[in-house]
Regions:
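Conserved alpha-helix/loop element of class I SAM-dependent methyltransferases that forms part
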Residues: 11-30
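Conserved class I S-adenosyl-L-methionine
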Residues: 30-38, 138-159
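Class I SAM-dependent methyltransferase SAM/SAH-binding core
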Residues: 48-96
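Short conserved loop adjoining the S-adenosyl-L-methionine
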Residues: 97-102
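A short SAM/SAH-binding and catalytic strip from SAM-dependent methyltransferases
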Residues: 107-121
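A short glycine-rich, Lys/Arg-flanked "PGG" loop and its adjoining helix->strand segment in the class I
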Residues: 122-136
Length: 160
């Protein structure tokens, strides 16, 4: 599998995700629904937290070929082949508003994905449906205020 950037950056990103999961009070044995899983950065932390008796349903509206330099397909295949892969089900090209959900979840997670919603009304529709299938909803999003000059380029690219 391809890697991007230095391993120290990857460790920092993983520590961030592990901290989020801890703040969400994810426990062993929980059933978690993750909206906007992307390449699975938060998914991996969730799967670790729920343990062998838990389950993570990770969905994303993007397809397997989305993402560079690592696509969602490459990333999710790699995760599924890992020791925690049996705790996760990925559903890509899935629109949560139209997909069939027959099971209840302990918690729904939206981690760093809100800015992909083009309309606030769509996000509101997601949240209303999530209330019906999950006991709790946890949200984490990047702060869009830059505080250091070196953050400005990323801020502008994210704002497009």
């Amino acid at each position: 599998m391809k890697t991007v950037g230095s391993s120290s950056i990857q460790r920092i990103q993983l520590q961030h995700r592990l901290g989020l999961v801890q703040s969400f009070n994810i426990e062993k044995g929980m059933r978690v629904l993750e909206i906007g899983c992307g390449q699975g950065d938060t998914t991996v932390a969730l799967a670790d937290a729920v343990g062998e008796t838990g389950f993570v349903m990770a969905i994303d509206i993007a397809g397997r070929d989305y993402g560079k330099p690592i696509t969602l397909g490459e990333a999710t295949d790699f995760i599924k082949s890992s020791p925690i892969g049996n705790r996760i089900s990925f559903d890509l090209e899935a629109d949560f508003l139209t997909m069939k959900i027959d099971e209840a979840y302990d918690v729904a997670i939206l981690s760093h994905c809100l800015w992909y919603f083009q309309e606030p009304a769509t996000l509101l529709s997601y949240l209303k449906r999530l209330k019906k299938v999950a006991k709790r909803i946890c949200i984490a999003e990047w702060d869009l205020e830059w505080t250091k000059p070196e953050q400005l380029a990323h801020f502008y690219s994210a704002s497009i």
